Amino acid sequence: MSATVERCDVCIVGAGIAGLNALFTTSQYLSPGQRVILLDRRQRVGGMWVDTYDYVRLHQPHSFFTAGNIGWTLGAQPSHLATKHEVLTHFDHCLDVLRRRVTLDEYYGWTMQSDAEADGVVHVQCQSDDGRTMVVEARRLIKAIASDVEPNDPLPLSSTSVHSVSPNYCDMRTGDIDASNAPVWVIGSGKTAMDTALALITRHPGREVNLLAGSGTYFAHRDRLFPTGGKRWWGGVTFNAFVDEVTQLFDGTNEDEVARRWRERCGVWVTPRAGNFLLGLLSTVERDAIAEGLNDIVMDHFVDAVDRDGKTELQLRTGAVREIDPDSWIVNCTGYLLKHSRPYEPYTSPSGRVLSLNARAATLHLTTYMGYFLPHLMFTDQLTEVPLYELDMIELRRKCNAAFPHTIMTLALHNLSLMTDALPTKVFRDCGLDIARWYPAPRQLLGMAQFLSTHHRRRPHLQRTLDTVAERFDVHCAPLARGSAPTQPVPAPAAGRADHG
């Protein structure tokens, strides 16, 4: 059977938060009659939120998790941390809004298999879950695969005496694990582990819940980054100030010093040691509830659970062994982000017709920001001209997890500095993702003024830091080569931000 051929102006692959932001930006440049095709391997809009565990909540106040500047219809307090159901409902609302702006055709249950450019057209080969094939011929292609998060499977165990489960397939608040009073071992120390431990502890106070925490994780202190009441005017630490401080101190060689300074100023953690930071948020109330409810915290890494001589034991990476009760529950909370290694693909094709939002060529700190800002460069024909640095986040995490968060912030600040010179002011005004908006307008304006007055002269330091990371860890962290010539910086205007509209 021959493949169906569909033609459109823009094809967007991926209907998660990155894809919806790409669609939002696309809608700013197309007329209502121009056609966009949105396809996703899942059966609905939502990306990883379709598959994630049922008791998940957003890290940050809900209004900043959106497409562009589309407002929520929830009617909740600004500090509300939205649930999975609320997030998916908001995805539906965003899509409803965007359907009114462009001609949108949606293909769910379809996977992109390949793409190729020829004669100014991008040919996208796709296949459906039931085996049908389709070729999309588009003027532009945006691959919003982003982090490509997959559900976690239960950990494979040698023991037959304990239960191995994953939050993706086992809600801690229902079913057999909820009915059992056997001990639980939560494996991991990131956000999933904190959510899981908190769900277990609040559901059945006094139940034995243990944390096998690996190297430990520290979090950004939500109470300090998002203060409430009068403290929004004079308290807390604005995210812009926090990033500015971190990136001024970090030089590509001193990640341990930066982490110590940062934890003292704006960190919170549950474990006695905390070596990892993946931009997660935690409050004092959550931290205290988890810390008080845990029976034990073990700072080691899981290897296996085995039955030996009538006992069940956890085998740990250090060689230590920990005896556990029969019928214990082992919950895999080892994390989702940056675990799957796709082949490297640059963020743009040489023609600028293909934009790829992926972790092997990251340009900003969050996929939401990449989905929003990079299509603006694409549609203004600057995607191949502005010398953004791209970073292989997966490889850096493998080689030096401690340097990862500081490098990501440096990357984001450098590239946003370049975009500030290249894009109209309206692009930044319409970005509802900016958490600086948590604070009253005077504090926002002060932060913006400080950025505009310093970002040109600070850019060389950011470049040196990124170059140092690339050389020190032998990871890809550089601007894209333009043909055979070295990339030249975009000249900076005399002052302020270019305003093209």
Regions found by a protein language model. Give the residues of each.
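Rossmann-like dinucleotide-binding core of oxidoreductases
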Residues: 4-7, 11-12, 17-45, 141-262, ...
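Conserved Walker A/P-loop ATP-binding site and its immediately adjacent core
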Residues: 49
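N-terminal glycine-rich dinucleotide-binding loop that anchors FAD/FMN and/or NAD(P) in oxidoreductases
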Residues: 52-76, 227-247
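Short secondary-structure boundary/capping segments
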Residues: 53-56, 158-159, 225-229, 344-351
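Conserved N-terminal/central alpha/beta ligand/cofactor-binding core
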Residues: 65-96, 245-277
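Feature captures the FAD/FMN-dependent oxidoreductase FAD-binding
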Residues: 77-151, 278-279, 286-315
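Glycine-enriched catalytic-core subsegment of oxygenase/oxidase enzymes
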Residues: 198, 297-451, 481
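C-terminal catalytic lobe of FAD-dependent flavoproteins
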Residues: 262-340, 436-497
